[in-house]
Amino acid sequence: TDCFKRNDPMRPVTNALCNASPDADVEGMDANLLKNADQIYFARVTEAFAAPLDVTGYNYMPERFEMDHAYFPNKVFCATETAPADSCHGWSLVERFPFLIGDFVWTAMDYIGEAGIGRTLVDEPLEGLAEYPYRLAGTGDLDLCGRKRPRSYYRDCVWGIAKRPYLAVEPPCLYGKKQNTTMWGWPVVEEYWNYPGMEGKPVKVSVYSMAAETALYLNGKLIGVQPSGKPNHFIASFQLPYQPGELTAVNLEDGKEICRHTIRTPGLPAHIRL
């Protein structure tokens, strides 16, 4: 910390305490120590490490912020790593606690390495890192080209900055199957409505929405209205038989339309342009 301060005295210094995974294979180490230790013991084993820091970072330990603030009332905390699926709960803690200044997810953009830590398998168990041909981590709100993934649109709702509802469609070929997702992953969904040969087959649609209620329409026909917004973790869930055409989500407040978004089945290709 002293070295950093000599070179840059203006900005705060942070470092992270990391909760090891339950199956961590580290000799002589209780993998759940940092997460499950009682408050006084945790304070004793971490106090010297955290003392020089301006901001104490915790990785994957949201349950410790409130209890450790009681023991260290003058500390400033930050969630230095969190899992994508925990974004709603994690951000609610930032909004609730003034001593918790932010939440960082692992990770903003996908990357090469730690192959498959964010993968999802269908009707198969997940075990460790993925083998070749996996190369990407498979996590990240943005893909390697910088394009937003569904989880990024969900986070927009959590942050209160979403401009419209997002239609997260589970491909109908996955209906009734179990998606096994790592803690860094996200279910297989896409804002897409083109499944030839699946007409009449059931499909699940999750709408990411900040509104109190969300209505779903297929080809102008109301499928249903479901609660959404923060009390429902910003997700309105629907099931319907697939039919090509237009799928529309409408955000509602007090029964009045706020905004809408539509996805459409494309027509036949007309030509190729180079």
Annotate each predicted stretch with a short phrase.
Residues 2-7, 11-31, 38, 47-274:
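Substrate-binding clefts and catalytic carboxylate motifs of secreted carbohydrate-active enzymes
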